[in-house]
């Protein structure tokens, strides 16, 4: 965003004010002044200490209206599952050739799905995939024999999230071009899932802050009352 446009957006935003979710969505759409279809992101500050394994918040959620992004998917599997993966819409399908490509530095996909019987080989590239959030994981549904279901869910808008070292959770929840109602439904689905996953070991206030932002826009705070756990 150009300097003047960003300053104009800041001028329209009270950084101390918390908005109802519907109003926050309207505000973020109003102040986003870019010539492309900007992504809207949500950030939550959680009252957890991720240094403790029993306070790590991690999960997946199906956004009712998707993210608006075309997601590229690699399925790593043996030949018996390849046709099923292709039919489900996977962009790349294979086994040893993709392990080798990744070893050589290729990571040109958004999501990797794998069958359990190839995880031993895929472990060779865990140090490459892990830091990029691409390593398949049973908890997120990306290690499975039902590759067709996994591919279809990811393509339809299933996203994965995980708390970072500072106790924050970030996720894309749609595009500025979405209807406000669609964004509200996506955001509500995300918030409810994060609240549902509150660790029993977490003490004090769990949801400490919620904010929306779009590509290169200031953030807009969201009232927490309906989502406090």
Curated annotation (Swiss-Prot):
Belongs to the universal ribosomal protein uL1 family. Disulfide bonds: none annotated. Binds directly to 23S rRNA. The L1 stalk is quite mobile in the ribosome, and is involved in E site tRNA release. GO terms for biological process: regulation of translation; translation. It comes from Chlorobium phaeobacteroides (strain DSM 266 / SMG 266 / 2430). Part of the 50S ribosomal subunit. One of its GO terms (molecular function) is structural constituent of ribosome. This is Large ribosomal subunit protein uL1. PANTHER family: 54S RIBOSOMAL PROTEIN L1, MITOCHONDRIAL, LARGE RIBOSOMAL SUBUNIT PROTEIN UL1M. Keywords: Repressor, Ribonucleoprotein, Ribosomal protein, RNA-binding, rRNA-binding, Translation regulation, tRNA-binding. It comes from the Bacteria. GO terms for cellular component: large ribosomal subunit.
């Amino acid at each position: 965003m150009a300097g003047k446009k960003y300053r104009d957006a800041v001028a329209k935003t009270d950084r101390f004010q918390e908005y109802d979710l519907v109003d926050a969505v309207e505000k973020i759409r109003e102040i986003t002044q870019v010539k492309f279809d900007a992504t809207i992101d949500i950030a939550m500050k959680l009252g957890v200490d991720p240094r403790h394994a029993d306070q790590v918040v991690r999960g997946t959620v199906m956004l009712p209206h998707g993210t608006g992004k075309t997601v590229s998917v690699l399925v790593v599997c043996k030949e018996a599952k390849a046709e099923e993966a292709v039919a489900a819409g996977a962009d790349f399908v294979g086994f040893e050739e993709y392990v080798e490509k990744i070893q050589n530095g290729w990571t040109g996909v958004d999501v990797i799905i794998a069958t359990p019987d190839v995880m031993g080989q895929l472990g060779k590239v865990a140090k490459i995939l892990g830091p990029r959030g691409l390593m398949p994981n049973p908890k997120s549904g990306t290690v499975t024999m039902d590759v067709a279901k996994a591919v279809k869910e990811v393509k339809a808008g299933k996203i994965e999230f995980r708390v970072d070292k500072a106790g924050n959770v970030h996720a894309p929840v749609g595009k500025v071009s979405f209807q406000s109602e669609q964004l509200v439904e996506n955001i509500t689905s995300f918030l409810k899932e994060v609240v549902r996953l509150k660790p029993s070991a977490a003490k004090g206030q769990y949801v400490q802050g919620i904010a929306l932002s779009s590509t290169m826009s200031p953030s807009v705070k969201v009232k927490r009352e309906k989502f406090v756990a």
